[in-house]
Amino acid sequence: MAGIVTEPWSVAENGNPSITAKGSSRELRLGRTAHNMSSSSLRKKSDLRVIQKVPYKGLKDFLSNLQEVILGTKLAILFPAIPAAIICTYCGVSQPWIFGLSLLGLTPLAERVSFLTEQLAFYTGPTLGGLLNATCGNATELIIAILALTNNKVAVVKYSLLGSILSNLLLVLGTSLFCGGIANIRREQRFDRKQADVNFFLLLLGFLCHLLPLLVGYLKNGEASAAVLSDMQLSISRGFSIVMLISYIAYLVFQLWTHRQLFDAQEQEDEYDDDVEQETAVISFWSGFAWLVGMTLVIALLSEYVVATIEEASDKWNLSVSFISIILLPIVGNAAEHAGAVIFAFKNKLDISLGVALGSATQIGLFVVPLTIIVAWILGINMDLNFGPLETGCLAVSIIITAFTLQDGSSHYMKGLVLLLCYFIIAICFFVDKLPQKQNAIHLGHQAMNNVVTATGGGVFSS
């Protein structure tokens, strides 16, 4: 690997490296995933002229880090929602307010995690950096799923993960194709089908793993008791989850090592690409690592608030838990990534937009979902891959219609419009789901915990 140095980790803060980071600029670009390319469109350059005049190096480094990490994004305006959610918790404010503020606070945090993993990739090299980016790409969804699981809210876990897949396949991709088609209405937008084909093969594998446990419950009904059927579905799901994780590991090897060229973001010589080419690390390795740990802890805190208040928000807003989990959580939680995908579609860079939507859907379907099943298994919680007939049907239709939409390697606004309309149809279906809260929480086959109390200072959540 070109440009490797033997000196220990160190770099002067804010883009003035004292040594050469691992990998050349070209190699570092290869280590970036579509998630990072998408999120980078929401970043803004920092003006550090005032900070550079601070005489004390420690204070100057801290202020520089603060400027780059907190204020270096166009979503910085949403950061006040984080302390607001915490204060509302201590003051005993209505839980729907805490739920809404926590969701808003998660939006910039998800984008900043992407920024920090990219900063670390400057030091780890393109391969390890790409692996880090791929692993942390959906950290918010994984944290919410695990916290909901520890509260025994299995339905919320299933709904939120399914919603993330549907959102990426229909909403994000549909909006990107529609906006890109309108912005480039006088010319045909084209993209490389190869990476899309790989993602669809894996998504179909994931769908098969969801379909078979569902069919077992129907085909074996009457031949065995409900308890036996439940055990069969649980055992099948755990076995399938191991297979899904193996397939995801193979996908990472395929993406980062053997066929990396298929997943490279398209490289056109324009102003944006020149900017990307000149990017350097703006914070040191250990500063980036510390910020990443801190951001992850804050995401975990806000995710706990979201999980603990979702039923109360459902009652107050007269919305079903299924609608909030499948529609609202993915839209707000991934707003930064979604906006970036649309921006690149406007720039006629559909390969990046596709990489965001399909890559994220694949990661959730083949990594986050089976990992959640394994974690539930370890915790002694019965969670399977049977998401229900309606939910599994929505997943199947979404994968099939998206595959047909992208089969010819070209795009126009009508394709995006159809995907968006499909998403609206699914949203309407879950919007009219008015099952009572307790039934809504258990209708996927698992009894929710009757009383989950989370005490954080003066704030107490009950569900």
Curated annotation (Swiss-Prot):
Q: Which stretches of sequence are listed as region Required for Ca(2+)/H(+) exchange activity?
A: 87-95
Is Transmembrane found in the keyword set?
Answer: yes
Quote the record's activity regulation: Activated by monothiol glutaredoxin GRXS14 and CXIP4. Inhibited by excess of Ca(2+) and Cd(2+), Na(+) and K(+), but not Mn(2+).
Q: Main subcellular localization, coarse class?
A: membrane
pH dependence comment: Optimum pH is 7.5 for cytosolic pH.
Which residues does the record list as N-acetylalanine (modified residue)? A2
In its UniProt entry, what is this protein called? Vacuolar cation/proton exchanger 1
Could you read off the lineage of the organism from its UniProt record? Eukaryota, Viridiplantae, Streptophyta, Embryophyta, Tracheophyta
